[in-house]
Amino acid sequence: LPLDVAIECLTLRESRRDIDVVRDPVEEELLKEVEVIEATKKALQQRVSQAFQQLCLLQEVRQQLCSDHRDKMESLDIDRGCLSLNL
């Protein structure tokens, strides 16, 4: 929404008649605001992408850990069965 407002303000300023078109501090600040918002938006999108990739990696690790845990529990049951046979 702030980006849309700043762009709309710039668009309205650019649509003025030739004698009303000025390059003043207000326009400079609007341009800076658009630039900052777009840079922040891009940085946030990169962070979201990185977070998603990390989440995918963590899910893979979790699945591997669950599989390892099942295997270890199965091995423990086998070892207990063998121990009871020896007694």
Swiss-Prot record:
It is found in: Cytoplasm, Cytoskeleton, Cilium axoneme; Cytoplasm, Cytoskeleton, Flagellum axoneme; Cytoplasm, Cytoskeleton, Microtubule organizing center. It comes from the Eukaryota. GO terms for cellular component: axonemal A tubule inner sheath; axonemal microtubule; microtubule organizing center; nucleus; sperm flagellum. Detected in sperm flagella (at protein level). Residues 26-55 form a coiled coil. Keywords: Cell projection, Cilium, Cilium biogenesis/degradation, Coiled coil, Cytoplasm, Cytoskeleton, Flagellum, Microtubule, Phosphoprotein, Ubl conjugation. Tyrosine phosphorylated. Ubiquitinated, leading to its degradation. Deubiquitinated by USP16, promoting its stability. One of its GO terms (biological process) is flagellated sperm motility. InterPro entries: Tektin-like, Tektins. Pfam families: Tektin (PF03148). Belongs to the tektin family. Microtubule inner protein component of sperm flagellar doublet microtubules. May interact with CCDC172. Microtubule inner protein (MIP) part of the dynein-decorated doublet microtubules (DMTs) in cilia and flagellar axoneme. Plays a key role in the assembly or attachment of the inner dynein arm to microtubules in sperm flagella and tracheal cilia. Forms filamentous polymers in the walls of ciliary and flagellar microtubules. This is Tektin-2. The lineage of its organism: Eukaryota, Metazoa, Chordata, Craniata, Vertebrata.
